[in-house]
């Protein structure tokens, strides 16, 4: 970095910020961004030019991000459609299997699904804090 030509700390800071901004946005976009050279005679105009370049780069990044987000949203919508369709198909298959199964098969299947759950015919009575049933 060549900072000898800059007289004030502000000029050096602007130069460093410019280089950081350009290299940061270049790395994000994967392309080359033209550098703006600062000189002592027109530092005010250079700062405006730098601000404009930074704003343009930020707009470009924003546009790229918006495009990527829209693309991802479309992909996710398609996945949701596919999952809803598959879910409907599985529900139809489940209904068909339930209608074709005998009551004994259904009972056996239900017992295999939830062996640790209590039977629904024995309701649980909540206990009061003192240990007695309410």
Curated annotation (Swiss-Prot):
Similarity comment text for this entry: Belongs to the TSC-22/Dip/Bun family.
Keywords recorded for this protein, A-Z: Acetylation, Cytoplasm, Nucleus, Phosphoprotein
CDD domains: ZIP_TSC22D3
The protein's name in its UniProt record: TSC22 domain family protein 3
Pfam family name, one: TSC22
Region called Leucine-zipper, residue ranges: 76-97
Description of what induces expression: Induced in T-lymphocytes by IL2 deprivation.
Gene: TSC22D3
Biological processes annotated in GO: negative regulation of activation-induced cell death of T cells; regulation of transcription by RNA polymerase II; response to osmotic stress
Residue numbers of Phosphoserine PTMs: 102
Residues covered by region (Disordered): 108-134
Region (AP1-binding): 1-60
Subunit structure: Can form homodimers, however it is likely to function as a monomer. Interacts with NFKB1. Interacts (via N-terminus) with JUN and FOS; these interactions inhibit the binding of active AP1 to its target DNA.
Tissue expression: Ubiquitously expressed, including in the fetal brain and liver. Expressed in brain, lung, spleen and skeletal muscle. Lower levels detected in heart and kidney. Not detected in the pancreas. In non-lymphoid tissues, in the absence of inflammation, the major source of constitutive expression is the macrophage lineage. Also expressed in cells from different hemopoietic cell lineages, including bone marrow cells, CD34+ stem cells, mature B- and T-cells, monocytes and granulocytes.
S-S pairs: none
Function per UniProt: Protects T-cells from IL2 deprivation-induced apoptosis through the inhibition of FOXO3A transcriptional activity that leads to the down-regulation of the pro-apoptotic factor BCL2L11. In macrophages, plays a role in the anti-inflammatory and immunosuppressive effects of glucocorticoids and IL10. In T-cells, inhibits anti-CD3-induced NFKB1 nuclear translocation and thereby NFKB1 DNA-binding activities. In vitro, suppresses AP-1 transcription factor complex DNA-binding activities.
Domain topic, free-text comment: The leucine-zipper is involved in homodimerization.
N-acetylmethionine: residues bearing it: 1
Superkingdom, natural source: Eukaryota
GO CC terms in record: cytosol; nucleus
InterPro entries: TSC22/Bun, TSC22/BUN_CS
Cytoplasm in keyword set: yes
